[in-house]
């Protein structure tokens, strides 16, 4: 009798396991748990040369107006940019959080170029949420963003490759917090 009860428990466990695995298979196959949106599309146009020239002229005139000496240029940038590859940005972008939806890498490049007029920026999605696929897409997107921006002495924006590394410790001595890792190079063979 005891053996029979034990066999019934094992049988129930097997049926439950097979049912759970089947449900998981269908959930993954039909995208019920979400789908990978990919890196998005970067607009294949840089800021028109007239606009860049106008910005430079405005800066030069402003420099003269206040009597500043020298020709140094102030650059504006953002070295902490997240896309929805980062969990916190993903949650904040959900419509139920009053967000506007997915914000992929292509949107980050376009926003830096056309909306915020950044001279430079760095992608810094959370390293903990990265996968080999996402990292590869990140590298390709940053390379594309810079290719559109133009090479040489006057690109419309410069995109840097990087990630945000987070370490939380239980004491001040072991807590390092958030650190942005930013690479000088974007060539595939020069980055991890």
Q: Which role does the model predict for each range below?
A:
Residues 10-192:
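Extended, charged catalytic domains and RNA/DNA-binding interfaces, predominantly
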């Amino acid at each position: 009798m005891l053996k029979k009860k034990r066999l019934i428990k094992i049988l129930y466990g097997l049926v439950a396991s097979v049912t759970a695995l089947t449900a998981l298979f269908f959930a993954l196959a039909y995208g019920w748990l979400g789908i990978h949106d990919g890196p998005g599309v970067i607009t294949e146009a840089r800021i028109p040369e007239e606009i860049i020239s106008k910005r430079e002229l405005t800066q030069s005139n402003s420099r003269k107006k206040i009597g500043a000496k020298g020709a140094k240029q102030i650059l504006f940038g953002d070295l902490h940019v997240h896309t929805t590859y980062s969990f916190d940005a993903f949650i904040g972008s959900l419509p139920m959080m009053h967000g506007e939806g997915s914000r992929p890498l292509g949107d980050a490049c376009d926003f830096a170029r056309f909306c915020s007029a950044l001279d430079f920026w760095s992608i810094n999605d959370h390293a903990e949420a990265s996968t080999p696929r996402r990292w590869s897409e990140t590298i390709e997107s940053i390379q594309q963003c810079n290719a559109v921006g133009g090479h040489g002495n006057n690109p419309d924006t410069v995109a840097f490759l990087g990630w945000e590394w987070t370490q939380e410790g239980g004491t001040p001595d072991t807590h390092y917090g958030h650190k942005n890792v930013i690479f000088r190079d974007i060539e595939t063979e020069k980055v991890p």
